[in-house]
Amino acid sequence: MTSKLPDWYSDVAKAGLPITLGIELLEVSGSRVVATMPVDERTRQPFGILHGGASIALAETVASFGAVASIDRERFVAVGQEINGNHIRPKLEGTVRAVGVPVHVGRTSQVWSIEITDEEGRLVCISRCTMAIVERR
């Protein structure tokens, strides 16, 4: 099977919040990002359901990697500027899957739409994330 992860991915995938939450990126490009996240003790809130903040962290991770995949990484960085999410259905256990696609790709910003679904394809959360594209200093 051919990897759907870019060559540069392994250099940036070794630390940070995605590792802590168990987020696994399956496909990364400037036109689509797919990732999964477990619903377990790391990602549930005290009442036993998927924490909304974990869903938002998954959504921003997807948007961030998509934005980074579409820019000149030598000259620019992509940083989260705004994110929102609507939590549609609770999730108690298992895995959620996020698919992100760009809605707008501009010179200084990108807007990504991310749908997070359960194993049956039912919508758990929908999010929109704006990424600022900033020149490296």
Language model features with spans:
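Terminal targeting signals and extreme-terminal segments of soluble enzymes
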Residues: 1-137
